[in-house]
Amino acid sequence: MDSNDVFKKLKSLANPKNVAGMARFGINPKNTLGISIPHLRKLAKELGKDHQLAQQLWDSGIHEAMILAGMVDDPKLVTKKQMDLWTSDFDSWDVCDQVCMNLFDKTPLAFQKAKEWAMRDKEFEKRAGFALMACLAWHDKEAGDVRFAQFFPLIKQAASDERNFVKKAVNWALRQIGKRNRNLNKMAIGTAKEILKMDSKIAKWIASDAIRELTSQAVQKRLT
């Protein structure tokens, strides 16, 4: 299936009724077709890995095509330049998160980029840094605790950022790292307690929400 066939397929799956619903969840409705993630996953499975196709999909600027690009790209072929270019194109939280969880967290540059982007000013670039931290904590089964411990100062530093899509990603990263194992759980709770002392409503929300989950019986039972 070449890129023209893929774009035809995407248009055939379009559901304009879904676009309004997506907008209510804070998803940018611009260039959006209203295709569900399960439909995109199914199409990605049919297409297999294709680095060139991924670039063509991304360059289209179509919301779902950009998500699909992250699903079909080959993480072994992704460069630092591509990661920065794609991140600078993020204009919706779901594209950001899907690309981080389907592609970026599988690249050798993931830990480096998470730290870099967490220091950025643009809302979705900054979100990408913390979303990538959360995805690495969720998916990377081999990385040691030291690599995740390096994220805590960045989480603390961004905890007073009032922008909705940043604060939620900071909270997500803190919770996800803290659910990885018992040692990181203690470190995450300690970081949350430090954040709780900050003179910021946003910081207090991030910290209290994380502490509530990380100290819960359900999470504590699963820790090793």
Model-assigned labels for residue ranges:
Residues 1-224:
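Alpha-helical scaffold domains
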